[in-house]
Regions:
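Conserved phosphate-binding loops in N-terminal lobes of ATP-dependent enzymes
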Residues: 2-67
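Short beta-strand-loop/turn "lid" adjacent to the catalytic site in phosphate-handling enzymes
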Residues: 43-92, 128-132, 137-140, 168-183
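Conserved phosphate-binding catalytic cores of ATP/NTP-utilizing and phosphoryl-transfer enzymes
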Residues: 81-111
Length: 194
């Protein structure tokens, strides 16, 4: 059976066709295109669908998915196989989906899930199947935008991975600060959570 997995994030809409526990095709859109999703459903004969949405709710899409597929919603349908002191009503669908995937793949292990999107999120699943929410920090684009918005002479850049810790110009200074800053942040969280 073919499954359609839809992730409506803050920056992109990601769609994946899933069959036999494998992703067989992926699509990425800058914004929600319901007609494209309907075309994908028809072309690939989708039977089941799941929606993760951390952006504005789209009831039209949910109605279509409920009408044309066996529809799964994280907020309404999920039976959480893990315990949590954190209020799961506050957890975004994206974080919930990732922690459930970590539970499915590594049920007896401690797992740190790092998701790099609009924001960077850190979530833990213990070997005793307890969910422990970690931090949320600005993602790459958000960091670059906040620098350019807050500093008159620093413009937005399209960053590349720095070749060195020593800058040769303003662009490379921003790349070092932002990209290597994220890298060290992640290493720091990994170290703290060990």
């Amino acid at each position: 059976m073919r499954n359609l997995l839809i992730d409506i994030g803050n920056s992109f809409v990601k769609v994946a066709l899933h069959e036999d526990r494998k992703v067989i095709k992926e699509f990425k859109f800058d914004d929600l295109k319901i007609d494209e999703i309907v075309n994908i459903m028809k072309k690939y004969k989708v039977v089941n669908s799941a929606l993760s949405n951390v952006s504005n709710p789209n009831h039209e899409l949910e109605i279509i998915l409920k009408d044309q597929t066996s529809f799964f919603s994280f907020k309404n349908d999920v039976k959480i196989p893990i315990n949590s002191p954190y209020s799961l009503k506050e957890v975004g669908d994206d974080r919930l989906a990732l922690i459930l995937a970590a539970h499915d793949e590594f049920p007896n292990d401690n797992v740190l899930v790092v998701d790099m999107g609009t924001c960077i999120t850190y979530d833990l699943k213990s070997s005793s199947n307890e969910y422990k929410a970690g931090g949320i920090s600005p993602g790459l684009k958000m960091r670059i935008k906040s620098i350019s918005d807050g500093a008159f002479k620093l413009k937005e850049i399209n960053p590349e991975y720095p070749k060195s810790y020593i800058a040769s110009d303003t662009k490379s200074s921003l790349e070092i600060g932002v990209i290597l800053g994220i890298q060290h942040e992640i290493k720091g969280f990994i170290s703290e959570y060990r």
